[in-house]
Design a protein with these regions (language model features):
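Catalytic-domain carbohydrate-binding cleft regions of carbohydrate-active enzymes
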Residues: 1-193
Length: 193
């Protein structure tokens, strides 16, 4: 989700980068992110955040042919109130994070909502009930669905999974488990995407 990591892949592993571009063309890889890196969004000023978006979106468009419309910040600890305005003016319509699920004292009670910025700009935000735990089991799917409070707004939520909390992708075993879970009676309907 970070343009910088794609740049490193292009520079050091050009064959892998070529394969990624092919998967994007096939619709099997969704390049998402919109920023150069996944930054801290509490301390930097607006200009810094604008440049993150400028350089990130430029890379995704020029190198991968993708015009990102989602700001994907699953592991950022806080969010500047100017972000909705910056996103809106940059063609970003959606926001995704998981960090707000970490609060054990004051649980964040919203999953899908319009996030309004300083100037009234708004973007559609989604925060799944389950964060970056990384696993995919019947218990995880049930916890994700049961904790999703906005079913009346949208019948869909996201359950992220992958190898560890550090950006690792799904393992072959996890993908097979997800395929099997799709067929199990009594679990929420699921799709791998």
């Amino acid at each position: 989700s970070q343009a910088y990591l794609y740049q490193l892949t292009k520079d050091h592993y050009p064959e892998v980068f070529k394969e990624i571009k092919q998967r994007i063309a096939e619709g099997r890889w969704h390049a998402i992110g919109s920023m150069w890196v996944e930054p801290d969004c509490n301390i930097p000023n607006g200009e810094s955040l604008v440049r993150q978006v400028l350089h990130g979106k430029r890379f995704f468009k020029n190198e991968l042919g993708v015009d990102c419309d989602t700001l994907w910040l699953p592991d950022t600890f806080g969010y500047n109130w100017a972000l909705p305005q910056i996103m809106k003016k940059s063609g970003i319509r959606y926001f995704f994070t998981t960090k707000l699920t970490w609060n054990d004292t004051n649980p964040f009670r919203h999953n899908t909502f319009w996030w309004r910025g300083i100037d009234g700009s708004k973007v559609l935000a989604h925060i799944p009930a389950v964060g970056l735990e990384g696993s995919i089991t019947p218990k995880d799917l049930k916890k994700s669905w049961d904790g999703y409070h906005e079913k009346q707004k949208s019948p869909h939520t996201i359950q992220t999974f992958g190898y560890g909390d550090g950006g690792g992708g799904p393992t072959a075993e996890q993908l097979e488990t997800a395929r099997v879970l799709k067929t199990m009676v009594g679990l929420p309907a699921s799709t791998i995407s």
